[in-house]
């Protein structure tokens, strides 16, 4: 495995150069443009052409491009925007939100996660707990000092337009259904589900039909993305192996929790065949995404961090 270091501390920034090489940015309120602030790029970060900070405050995550590269959808719990837990927001490329608030495009009910544009650029899929209650579900506390994530059984996957109107519910099975992303071919969705009693990957058509199970090994399989040609999937998984690891994983899962601190990357064909482990680095290896060539993977990791932080970006070959 050939690894390449792309040093960057992960805070709420977006590398616009991935899609847009223009050396300017728009003011979200006035529409005026000004030069990129290159002070965000450290001298060692030779792979970045430009970088712009988009959000200021709160937790802002899961930011994904529209198919036409003109807009970005993301989730935020920014209290300055009136949020108690994650909701979905929309922005045009070049917008920043230091002194303004982007339009919210989810219902404002429950908690939401992992939005992704559909090919028409007029609608998107996302996970939401709102059918289980209008309020934000309770956030878990650390267990014995360990960081844990909630796996709310009220999460289902929905389709909505960019005004926030839900147009379709794609999942109805009991338990957690979330983390949906769409194939660049525009024909399939991959998502994580608890419908078998464990957190496995599934695919379906973009209309919710033809659901197929992709993974079937014990562990939290999630955060999956298609390759540019739609033939492969990259994802991260915990895959506990020892009796102690298995017991801890299963005990937490019974409480609707996971501990996402030991995750490695896996790759397989879109039908689940030819599954193989891609990294063996230790700690948390996260957010894998295919390079446009389809031959490399970009991901975030803290494997070199002594105390679990900071996270940095890396690139590896798929072989």
PLM feature segments, named:
Residues 29-49, 155:
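Blade/loop signatures of beta-propeller domains
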Residues 16-17:
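C-terminal motif of bacterial Sec signal peptides marking the signal peptidase cleavage site
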Residues 56-59, 76-88, 106-112, 127-156, ...:
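A flexible loop/linker signature enriched in serine peptidases of the S9 family
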Residues 67-68, 119-120, 184-185, 228-229, ...:
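Residue-level detector of Asp-centered blade-edge/turn motifs that repeat once per structural unit
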Residues 93-96, 161-165, 205-209, 269-273, ...:
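Short loop/turn segments that connect beta-strands within beta-propeller blades
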Residues 72-73, 124, 189, 233, ...:
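Hydrophobic beta-strand positions that form the internal "hydrophobic ladder"
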Residues 50-53, 98-103, 147, 165-168, ...:
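Predominantly a core beta-strand signature of beta-propeller blades
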